[in-house]
UniProtKB/Swiss-Prot annotation:
This is Nucleoprotein. Encapsidates the genome, protecting it from nucleases. If expressed without protein P it binds non-specifically RNA and therefore can bind it's own mRNA. Interaction with protein P abolishes any non-specific RNA binding, and prevents phosphorylation. The soluble N-P complex encapsidates specifically the genomic RNA, with protein N protecting the genome like a pearl necklace. The encapsidated genomic RNA is termed the nucleocapsid (NC) and serves as template for viral transcription and replication. Protein N binds protein P in the NC through a different interaction, and can be phosphorylated. The keyword Phosphoprotein applies. It comes from the Viruses. It comes from European bat lyssavirus 2 (strain Human/Scotland/RV1333/2002). Belongs to the lyssavirus nucleocapsid protein family. GO terms for molecular function: RNA binding.
Length: 451
C-alpha cells in the first residue's frame, strides 16, 4: 500500500485515503536575466523638464500628485545626474558602462515612451514663474523618491516615527547642495495622499534605478539615496538575515548550514542558493531585482525561507539582539521546533569565542609558535552529552562542532533545557514586545513553562 495513505472505517466500511493539503500555487521567480536585455518600463511622452517641475511642485504644495506624471518626470530628470563610471560595470552579461564612461541612471535600464501627454501639458505650475536650477530639480527628485521610503515604513512603527523620518529627510533637501523648495511638513502631508505608492510598479522601478546608480557612482546629489535605499535587497529578508547570521557567529555559509538539523531546511537552502544568480556580485541587478520587476515572487523573502528565518532570529533573540526580538515570526514554519534548535545554537555561540595568537614580536617568535602548534597533539574527548549544564553554568559544551551540538540535542530528547528557557524568558520579558514578534512568541510560550 502507498506509504502516504491512511486506512480507517466509516460505518463499518473500510476507507483508504491520501491526505493532501493546500499547497503554494505561486512559483518563485529567480531574477537572473537570461536574454541580456536591460530591465524595461513604458511611460508617457517625455515632458518639458522645466514645465514638468513647475507642475509637480504645484501638485506637492496642494498634496495632489498624479503617479504617471511623477514617473514621467523622474525618468526625464535622470539626464541631470551625469557621473563617471569608476570601473567596467557588467551584470548578468549586460554591459552597463565601461570604466570612464559618462553615464546617468537612464543607462541602467530601458525606458520606452508613448505619445500620451502628461497633465502638465494641459495645466499646472502657473504659480511658479522662473525656470528651476539643477539643484531645485535635484531637491524635487529627492522629495518625490522619499515618498517611496515613507510608504515602506512598517505600520508597527507607532507614535511620531514616520513624521520624524519625513522631517529629517526634508532637512536634507533644504541644505546644500540642495535647496529648499517646500515648506516644513509638506513631505508628510503629501505622503498621506500617496501612502501606497511603493506598490506602483513604475514608481518602484524608478526608485530602484536611482538607488542602483547612486550606490555606485560618486555624485554631488548622492544623498537622493535617502529615499531609495530601501529598494536594495527588497523582499530579501531571508537571505539578508542569513548573511547577518553567519557574520554574527563568525562562520562561513557552508559551516553554518551544518548546524541546521531539520528536514524542512533542505528545500529552503536549495531555493536560497539557486545557481546562476548574482547574490555575491557588487552592484548587480540582483540587488534591486524586486524594484526592477525581475521577480514577481521573491525566493529570498522571509516567507520563502521561513524555517531558516525563524531559526536565525531565535538564535538572535537568545543573544539578546533587538532586531531579532522585533522581527515577525513566520507562524507557518515550525516556530516551536525552531525555538528549540535556536536555544541550542544560541547557547553554543553566545558568550564563547575561538581564539589564537596571530601577531608576534618578530619572525623568530612567529617561527617558534608555528613549530609548537605543528607538533601539538590535541586529545579531544567526544562530548557524550551527559554533563548537566543546567547545574554547571560554566560548562563549555565541548568542542564547537555540529556533531557535538546534535548529540546534546538528542541526549536531551529534542527539548530545551532549563538554562535555555531561563535565557529566552529573560530576554523576552525585558523587551517591549511587538505583536507577532519573536519576543512575544518566546514570552507567551516559555514564561509559564514549569521546567
Amino acid at each position: 500500500m502507498d506509504a502516504d495513505r491512511i486506512v480507517f472505517k466509516v460505518h463499518n466500511q473500510l476507507v483508504s485515503v491520501k491526505p493532501e493539503v493546500i499547497v503554494d500555487q505561486y512559483e518563485y521567480k529567480y531574477p537572473a536575466i537570461k536574454d541580456r536585455k536591460k530591465p524595461s518600463i513604458t511611460l508617457g511622452k517625455a515632458p518639458d523638464l522645466n514645465r514638468a517641475y513647475k507642475s509637480i511642485l504645484s501638485g506637492i504644495n496642494a498634496a495632489r500628485l498624479d503617479p504617471d506624471d511623477v514617473c514621467s518626470y523622474l525618468a526625464a530628470a535622470m539626464a541631470l545626474f551625469e557621473g563617471i563610471c569608476p570601473d567596467d560595470w557588467e551584470s548578468y552579461g549586460i554591459l552597463i558602462a565601461r570604466k570612464g564612461d559618462k553615464i546617468t541612471p537612464a543607462n541602467l535600464v530601458n525606458i520606452q515612451r508613448t505619445d500620451v501627454e502628461g497633465n502638465w501639458a494641459l495645466a499646472g505650475g502657473l504659480d511658479v514663474i522662473k525656470d528651476p536650477t539643477t539643484a531645485e530639480h535635484a531637491s524635487l527628485v529627492g522629495l518625490l523618491l522619499c515618498l517611496y521610503r515613507l510608504s515602506k515604513v512598517s505600520g508597527q512603527n507607532t507614535g511620531n516615527y514616520k513624521t520624524n523620518v519625513a522631517d529629517r529627510m526634508e532637512q536634507i533637501f533644504e541644505t546644500a547642495p540642495f535647496v529648499k523648495i517646500v515648506e516644513h511638513h509638506t513631505l508628510m502631508t503629501t505622503h498621506k495622499m500617496c501612502a501606497n505608492w511603493s506598490t506602483i510598479p513604475n514608481f518602484r522601478f524608478l526608485a530602484g534605478t536611482y538607488d542602483m546608480f547612486f550606490s555606485r557612482i560618486e555624485h554631488l546629489y548622492s544623498a537622493i539615496r535617502v529615499g531609495t535605499v530601501v529598494t536594495a535587497y527588497e523582499d530579501c529578508s531571508g537571505l539578508v538575515s542569513f548573511t547577518g547570521f553567519i557574520r554574527q557567529i563568525n562562520l562561513t555559509a557552508k559551516e553554518a548550514i551544518l548546524y541546521f538539523f531539520h528536514k524542512n531546511f533542505e528545500e529552503e537552502i536549495k531555493r536560497m542558493f539557486e545557481p546562476g544568480q548574482e547574490t555575491a556580485v557588487p552592484h548587480s541587478y540582483f540587488i534591486h531585482f524586486r524594484s526592477l520587476g525581475l521577480s514577481g515572487k521573491s525566493p529570498y523573502s522571509s516567507n520563502a525561507v521561513g524555517h531558516v528565518f525563524n531559526l536565525i532570529h531565535f538564535v538572535g533573540s537568545y543573544m539578546g539582539q533587538v532586531r531579532s526580538l522585533n522581527a515577525t515570526v513566520i507562524a507557518t514554519c515550525a516556530p516551536h521546533e525552531m525555538s528549540v534548535l535556536g536555544g541550542y545554537l544560541g547557547e553554543e555561540f553566545f558568550g564563547k569565542g575561538t581564539f589564537e595568537r596571530r601577531f608576534f614580536r618578530d619572525e623568530r617568535e612567529l617561527a617558534e609558535h608555528e613549530a609548537i602548534e605543528s607538533t601539538k597533539t590535541d586529545v579531544a574527548l567526544a562530548d557524550d552529552g551527559t554533563v548537566n549544564s543546567d547545574d554547571e553554568e560554566l560548562y563549555s559544551g565541548g568542542t564547537r562542532t555540529p556533531e557535538a551540538v546534535y548529540t546534546r540535542i538528542m541526549v536531551n530528547g529534542g527539548k530545551l533545557k532549563k538554562s535555555h528557557i531561563k535565557r529566552y524568558v529573560s530576554v523576552s520579558s525585558n523587551h517591549q514586545a511587538r505583536p507577532n514578534s519573536f519576543a512575544e512568541f518566546l514570552n507567551k510560550t516559555y514564561s509559564s513553562d514549569p521546567r
